[in-house]
Amino acid sequence: MNTVFEIVSQARRKNKLKRELLDNEKKVRDNRKRVELLENLLDYIKPNMSQDEIMTIIKNMKADYEDRVDDHIIKSAEISKARRDISRRIRELTEEDKQASGKK
């Protein structure tokens, strides 16, 4: 019976991670769009149009968004790995439960 509870618990955790993964992928998309926006902005701003400080600020903002994208990609990989581990554990528990039930 404990196996059933663990299977349910693991399945719920897996579903939670799936939702978190989808949310994280949305953040990756959003930040990629911001990076593209800032790249376009850098194409339009010329040194004779504005101060060099503005260029520096925009470049820093772009780098920050790129870092965020990288962080979200890493987090997605970690979440995916956790989900795979949970799926593997659920399969193992299910198999153990089947074997235990078959022996009775």
Swiss-Prot record:
Q: Which InterPro entries match?
A: DUF496
The yes or no answer to whether the keyword Cytoplasm is present is: yes
GO cellular component terms, A-Z: cytosol
The protein's location, in the record's own words, is:
Cytoplasm
Where does the protein principally reside?
Answer: cytoplasm
Q: Could you tell me which Pfam families the record lists for this protein?
A: DUF496
Alphabetical keyword list: Coiled coil, Cytoplasm
Q: Which residues form a coiled coil?
A: 13-43, 76-96
User: What function does the entry list?
Assistant: Pole-localizer protein involved in the regulation of several cellular processes.
Record-stated family: Belongs to the pole-localizer TmaR family.
What NCBIfam families does the entry give?
Answer: PRK05423.1
Question: What name does this protein carry?
Answer: Pole-localizer protein TmaR
From which organism does this entry originate?
Answer: Vibrio vulnificus (strain YJ016)
**Could you tell me the gene encoding this protein?**
tmaR
